[in-house]
């Protein structure tokens, strides 16, 4: 996967907003895996992947339905940003440790209480 920038995280969170809450963690991991696969495809064949783009998280995310960007104090949007960060972190840890078959732990998701 190409280097992850702020815009990649925002695009990923926007895509996750269109996914039902119970399926978001899996969707976040799939999004990161698709970006990685697209980058390997690009390097091997010298062209972008037809469905997942150029290997950036943003390209993979914007190829899916996505919601408009929300404010950072929106609890649902904040949870989606956290999930994208957790998915990237999980992907990096698996690459560094070489643990390919490990099952990912559920990320810690903060539930916001409105006052």
What are the roles of these predicted feature ranges?
Residues 1-36:
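Short terminal alpha-helical segments
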Residues 9, 24, 31, 55-57, ...:
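Generic signature of intrinsically disordered, low-complexity, basic-rich segments
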Residues 21, 35-43, 53-57, 89-92:
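Short alpha-helix boundary/capping elements
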Residues 41-75:
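Short, charged early-sequence alpha-helical segments and their helix-coil boundaries
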Residues 26-30, 45-48, 94-105:
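Short glycine-rich, low-complexity/disordered patches
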Residues 65-115:
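Amphipathic alpha-helical binding modules
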